[in-house]
Amino acid sequence: MPVAEIKNATQQPSSTNRVQAYAKLEFEKFSFFVQTLQVTMGRKASNSSDCDVHLGDTKAISRQHAKIFYSFPNQRFEISVMGKNGAFVDGEFVERGKSVPLRSGTRVQIGQISFSFLLPEGSEEDGHLKETGITPLSLQQGKIAYSDEFGGKPTGSFHTVTSNQEKDLLFSHIKHESDLPLGLSPADTNISNATSIIEHPDAANAHTLASLNQPPKHLTVSPSSIQRLSPQPYVRPTSDERPIETDSSVSAPKVANHDEELKQGKSTSPSDTVLHPDLNGSPDTGDATQKPNLSYANLIARTLIANPNKKMTLGDICEWIANNWSYYRHQPPAWHNSIRHNLSLNKAFIRIPRRQNEPGKGSFWMLDPSYIDQFEGNFFRRTKKPTPSATPAAHPDTARENELAAIQTKGISAGKTEQLNPQKETSRSKTHTSRGENVEDRPQSLLQNGIQPIIMRDGKLALNPEFFKNANGEQQAPNEQAVQAISLLQQHINKQLGPAAANNPEQATAIANALAVALAQKLQKQQTQMQGPQQVQQQAKRRKAYTSQQLNPAPTAMPHPNITSPSPSISVTQRPAVNVGPPPYVRPSAPSKLPDTRQSIGDPLPPGAMANVSAGPSSVRSSSYNSTASESKSEITSHQNLHTIPINKPFTSDRPLYSSPNDTLERVETGNQGQRMNSIGNASSFSKRDIMENENGSFDTNAKNGNNVDDSSSVRGMNLPSNSSDALRGVKRPLDETSSSYT
C-alpha cells in the first residue's frame, strides 16, 4: 500500500512533510501521536491546561488522571494512574498509584473515554523499542515538538533523525485534497508549527485505493480546522525517499473488515471479554434509541462480573454501563437512581465499606456468589424455598441448595438489624416465668465471645463447630433441621466460595461469615419460637388479670364523715343477715312483777331487737329536752347501718318495731338552744327510763292489767304541750286498735 510521508510545515509545500512519533493513542473520534517520552492525560481545566491530552470535563476524571511514559530500566512504555477513581487496562482495574506496562493494542478506559495504545509494526511483537534499534541515548538527542487538538502548545522545533531504524517509527498517512472536509482548501491547511496529525476517516476508502498509482498531493492539516473524525489503521513506511507500493490484496481486506466491525457496533473495549458462561456472552451496545432488554439488576451483575476485582463503586458501575450500552450513554442521569435502588434493595448485592485509610469515596458493591446462577438470561430470576412435596426426589442437591438460599435470604436482614442494635439482645437475655424462675432466652451476641464462625482448615474454609452450640448444643436435644441446615451451609461454602478463597481469602471469609451469622440467627429464632408458646400464654393471662384489676378496682370500706362509732359502754349484738322473712312470732312467758309500778307497752319486742341492759332500779332521769334529743340522735345514727334499734330506752308507743334501710332520718332543726331531732318516720318521742329484764330474758311492762301509762310519769322531765292528747298522739295507742303483724 503506497504511503506518503509528511514533513514539517516550515519546509516547502511541494516537498513531503514528516511527523515523528513514538506511539499513537487511537480514540473513538480522533488520534493523538505520542512525540515525547511522557504524556499526561486528565480533565480539561477552565483556567489553564495542565495536561497534554484532555479527556473531557467530567468530574469523575481528575485534572491529572494518568501518565504514559517510557521506562528506561524496563525499556517499555508504561501507564501510571494518578486519579482517585483509577482506570481500566485491558478490562482490569488499576488503582491509584500503580503502574502497568503497555503493549501495542492495549485498551485503556478512563471514565467514559476509552482509547487504544498502538506501536509501530516493527515493535508490535514484544512492545519494546529496543527491538527497533532505538537506544535511550538516541531518544534524548532530539527536541520533539508536539501539539494536540485541545490547545496544546508546540514545545520546540522539528529535529530530523537520520537513523534508518528510527525512521521506521514514522507514522505517515495519505491526505488527498478530495478527502478533506468540505470548505477546506490546500491553502487553508498550510499552517506553520503544526506537527500533530489527525486522521480522516475516508483516507483508505475504495477511491483512494484505486488512485494509489497516481502521485498524490501531500497536505498538512491543522488541528484547528479539522473535525473530530473516526480513526483509521496506520501503515508503516519503509523508505524516506519515495512512496513504496504494497500489496493491496493484503491491506484491503483488513480495512474492509475493520469497516464492517464499525458498522456492526463491535468494540475492542473490556466488554468484549466473556463475563460469565451463564450470562449469554458479552453485552451488545445496540442502538442508542432502543433500550436494552436487560433489567437493572442484570446490568449490575454483568458489570460486577466483568470487573476482575469483583467489586465496584456506584459511580464506576454507572460509568461502565454507559460505556457499554449506548442507550444509557445518551439518556439523562436519572437512571443512576434506579441503579442505586437496586443495589440497596436487592439481596444479591453486598455492600463493602472502604477501609479507614483507603482513598476514594463511596462504598464498594459486590455480587453474592450464591446468586450468580439467578442472573441467567436477561432478568433476575428469584428462587423461593420449595415445599417438600414439590421437591423432586431425583435431584436432592438442587433441593438442598434452594433451601439454603431461602434460609440465607431471610436471615441477611435479621443479621444486619441485630448487629446494628446489640443492646436489644442484652435486654432480652433473661425472661421471668410464671414460677418466678429466670430462664436464659438467647445469647447476648454471636461474636462477643470471640468465636469466629468460619475457620481455615487445611487451606479451606470450614464452619467452626463451637459457633453453633447456642442453637444446637448440649443444653437441649439435637435438632435435625438445624443439623441439616449447617451441613448444607458447609457444602455451599466448599462449592461456591472454595475457588474464590484461593484468590481473595479475605473477601471469601467475609462472605462466609455473613452467611454463617445469618443461619445462626435464623436457628435461634426458631428455637425461641418452639420454647415460648406456653410461656407466652401464661404471660398473656397475667397481663389480662392485671388489666382487669386496673379497670375495675375492688370497693374499699370508706367511713362516712357523719357516722360515729358506737359508745363502748353499749354492747349491741348484730343481727345476722337473713334473706328470708322474719321467723314466726312466739309470745314470751308472763313477766314477773317488777318493783316499779309504772305501766308500759304490753307488746314485747319482736325477735331480732335484742339488747344487754343491766338490771337496776327503774327511775326516770331528769334532763332537758335538748340533751335527750342529742343523745338519741347519736345512738340512732351509730346503729342505722346495722338495721337494728337501740333498746336502752323504753318505748312509750306501739310504733312499728322493724326499721328498714329505706327509713329516712329527718334532719335536725337547729334552734337557739341546740339541735332538735325528729323521730324516724312517724315514730313519737319517748322518755328516758330504764328497762328491767326479768329472769326469763323478757322485758318488764306494766300493761298486764290493761292499765294505760300515766302521762305525767311517762313523759316526766320533758316540756310537752298542755294538751295530753296531743302529747300522746302517735306515741301510744290502745292494744285493740290494730292487731299485731306478728300474730
Curated annotation (Swiss-Prot):
Keywords: Activator, Cell cycle, Cell division, DNA-binding, Mitosis, Nucleus, Septation, Transcription, Transcription regulation. Residues 214-291, 411-450, 529-743 are annotated as: Disordered. It is found in: Nucleus. Gene3D superfamilies: 2.60.200.20, Winged helix-like DNA-binding domain superfamily/Winged helix DNA-binding domain. PROSITE patterns: FHA_DOMAIN (PS50006), FORK_HEAD_3 (PS50039). Residues 221-230, 562-576, 625-643, 670-686, 695-726 have a biased composition (Polar residues). It comes from the Eukaryota. Residues 39-94 form the FHA domain. GO terms for molecular function: DNA-binding transcription activator activity, RNA polymerase II-specific; RNA polymerase II cis-regulatory region sequence-specific DNA binding; sequence-specific DNA binding. Residues 529-539, 614-624 have a biased composition (Low complexity). Residues 291-385 bind DNA. Disruption phenotype: Decreases cell population growth rate and increases cell-length; elongated cells are occasionally multiseptate. Resistance to methyl methanesulfonate. Its main location: nucleus. Residues 434-443 have a biased composition (Basic and acidic residues). One of its GO terms (biological process) is positive regulation of ribosomal protein gene transcription by RNA polymerase II. Acts as a transcriptional activator for ribosomal protein genes (RPG) that contain a HomolE UAS (upstream activating sequence) in addition to a HomolD promoter element; HomolD plays the role of a TATA box in RPG promoters that do not contain a canonical TATA sequence. Binds to HomolE elements with consensus sequence 3'-ACCCTACCCT-5' (or its inverted form AGGGTAGGGT). This is Fork head transcription factor 1. It comes from Schizosaccharomyces pombe (strain 972 / ATCC 24843) (Fission yeast). The lineage of its organism: Eukaryota, Fungi, Dikarya, Ascomycota, Taphrinomycotina.
